[in-house]
């Protein structure tokens, strides 16, 4: 399962871009509009956190600027009748912190501004998010809010565990990274750890 990708921009469409990795393989990555709008020129380096959607007739990659945004996407697609395209439309209009405020304010109208979401669907999504966002307690947000290295370490180890890395493998790498740069947030620490772990393997 692809969870992170680095490469160079080969092509850009209205909803996606093609990222060519160092090995010469090109992947089409669907992106929220805020990422598409600030993509660099062709040939420039990019990196995204990825969620892979496997269907009977296709394998689709969805890319995000950080771990928090990726986790928010997963929460959204766990809601009944919310598919990947709708979840991406939500994140094209609202960032994760915006979405949390919408849930806290019980703002149904804000969700109806998303293309394809009517009032009834917005009410259903909001109800589900009240439960799911609280239960999930999205890790990157907690790390950023706390600003505590210990919290960053804990949340990054948990995120790597979700990607299949054992704690005894991930924790020493992260401790070393955070020792060198204690000001890193969860997303930055996770990115550095993934690079280090990939080299080690």
Curated annotation (Swiss-Prot):
MF annotations from Gene Ontology: ATP binding; four-way junction DNA binding; four-way junction helicase activity
InterPro entries xref list: DNA_helicase_Holl-junc_RuvA_I (IPR013849), NA-bd_OB-fold (IPR012340), RuvA (IPR000085), RuvA_2-like (IPR010994), RuvA_C (IPR011114), RuvA_C_sf (IPR036267)
Keyword DNA-binding annotated: yes
Chain residue ranges for the region called Flexible linker: 143-147
Gene Ontology cellular component list: cytoplasm; Holliday junction helicase complex; Holliday junction resolvase complex
Region entry Domain II, spans: 66-143
Swiss-Prot/TrEMBL keywords: Cytoplasm, DNA damage, DNA recombination, DNA repair, DNA-binding
One Pfam family, short name: HHH_5
Region (Domain III) residue spans: 148-201
Primary location: cytoplasm
An individual GO BP term: DNA recombination
Function of the protein: The RuvA-RuvB-RuvC complex processes Holliday junction (HJ) DNA during genetic recombination and DNA repair, while the RuvA-RuvB complex plays an important role in the rescue of blocked DNA replication forks via replication fork reversal (RFR). RuvA specifically binds to HJ cruciform DNA, conferring on it an open structure. The RuvB hexamer acts as an ATP-dependent pump, pulling dsDNA into and through the RuvAB complex. HJ branch migration allows RuvC to scan DNA until it finds its consensus sequence, where it cleaves and resolves the cruciform DNA.
Domains: entry comment: Has three domains with a flexible linker between the domains II and III and assumes an 'L' shape. Domain III is highly mobile and contacts RuvB.
Subunit organization: Homotetramer. Forms an RuvA(8)-RuvB(12)-Holliday junction (HJ) complex. HJ DNA is sandwiched between 2 RuvA tetramers; dsDNA enters through RuvA and exits via RuvB. An RuvB hexamer assembles on each DNA strand where it exits the tetramer. Each RuvB hexamer is contacted by two RuvA subunits (via domain III) on 2 adjacent RuvB subunits; this complex drives branch migration. In the full resolvosome a probable DNA-RuvA(4)-RuvB(12)-RuvC(2) complex forms which resolves the HJ.
Protein name: Holliday junction branch migration complex subunit RuvA
Organism: Oleidesulfovibrio alaskensis (strain ATCC BAA-1058 / DSM 17464 / G20)
